[in-house]
């Protein structure tokens, strides 16, 4: 049985013209207007790319530093040894440890949003695949989460650095702020995301790379964005 849409959602959907491609700024303004839930909704982008991720040369997994931040408190955990544990804690890591932290994670402790590891810890982390893999939390060099420079990594992820990847159908789902952000700030973050994807275009991608871009608040309707206008946009961060 089809679930009946709430009056709130019906009113939000009515504001979106599905036959139209919205300019990037219009789309941000409409996202804010249709974010009518009783909490500060997350701004989400859903980007369909012309790739087939089953081929290794058509995959995207990388990071973006959102210039206006994520609007969220990011909990960072670090796996390291010796002095590196203190370095991570001093840099602001919420949790830091070595073998004992691995054991806690194995037992189900997942009280973090990002897991960073030093390269020497990776052989031991391999056994955490069952816990970390399904949540996309396994540290990786491509994701910027395997590094010896823990202070820089902790600070970047705390400040608004996000890891993202294309799913098996070639779609990138990623948050880029909060509905309470100004339209200009949301646009600055979306532009940074677009530029990051273009810089990391897989070598095996053929034909039209950008297919569709939709944005929405977490409880709002999808809003189609004019891809060419977004890519042509020269955004000056004041």
From Swiss-Prot:
Q: Which GO terms describe its cellular component?
A: large ribosomal subunit
GO biological process annotations for this chain's record?
regulation of translation; translation
* SUPFAM superfamilies membership: Ribosomal protein L1
Keywords for the protein's UniProt record, in alphabetical order: Repressor, Ribonucleoprotein, Ribosomal protein, RNA-binding, rRNA-binding, Translation regulation, tRNA-binding
**Which Pfam families has this protein been placed in?**
Ribosomal_L1 (PF00687)
Q: Which terms in the Gene Ontology molecular function aspect does this entry carry? A: rRNA binding; structural constituent of ribosome; tRNA binding
- Write down the InterPro entries for this protein, in alphabetical order: Ribosom_uL1_bac-type, Ribosomal_uL1, Ribosomal_uL1-like, Ribosomal_uL1/biogenesis, Ribosomal_uL1_3-a/b-sand, Ribosomal_uL1_CS
Function according to Swiss-Prot or TrEMBL? Binds directly to 23S rRNA. The L1 stalk is quite mobile in the ribosome, and is involved in E site tRNA release.
Q: Which family does it belong to?
A: Belongs to the universal ribosomal protein uL1 family.
Subunit composition? Part of the 50S ribosomal subunit.
Q: What is this protein called?
A: Large ribosomal subunit protein uL1
Where is the organism placed in the taxonomic lineage, from the top? Bacteria, Bacillati, Cyanobacteriota, Cyanophyceae, Synechococcales
Gene name per UniProt = rplA
